[in-house]
Amino acid sequence: MFLVRDVMYCKPGKVRAMTEKFLAMNKIGERSGMPKMRVMTDLCAERYWTVVAEMEVPDLTAWQQMMSNPPGSEADMKEFEKIMKDYHDLVDTGKREIYKIEG
């Protein structure tokens, strides 16, 4: 089992908007069979205005397949695109972390 974590360092005042995007994506993702995503905001972190979204996947092959060919209908994919439109305006930078869950 692996934990895939996307860390977004938002621009000042943009955390709520980015959080809402991740929460909306999670609803669609769960409906279409993707793993449930945990969405977190910082109280104290490496940088202010941090949003973290993470999910557990059984293996990296499954995650890679999910990223290259997401489950769900064409309408779901269009809704994903609509939700994430202009998200770059909310974010300074970000990173992805992948961890093997040992126990």
PLM regions: where:
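An amphipathic, aromatic/His-enriched active-site/gating alpha helix that lines ligand/cofactor pockets
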Residues: E20-R38, E54-I98
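Short coil/turn motifs at secondary-structure junctions
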Residues: K11-G13, C44, P58-L60
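Short, surface-exposed ligand-recognition loops at beta-strand->loop->(often short) alpha-helix junctions
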Residues: Y9-E20
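A general secondary-structure junction signal
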Residues: T41-L43, I98-E102
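A short beta-turn/loop motif at secondary-structure boundaries
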Residues: T41-R47, Y87
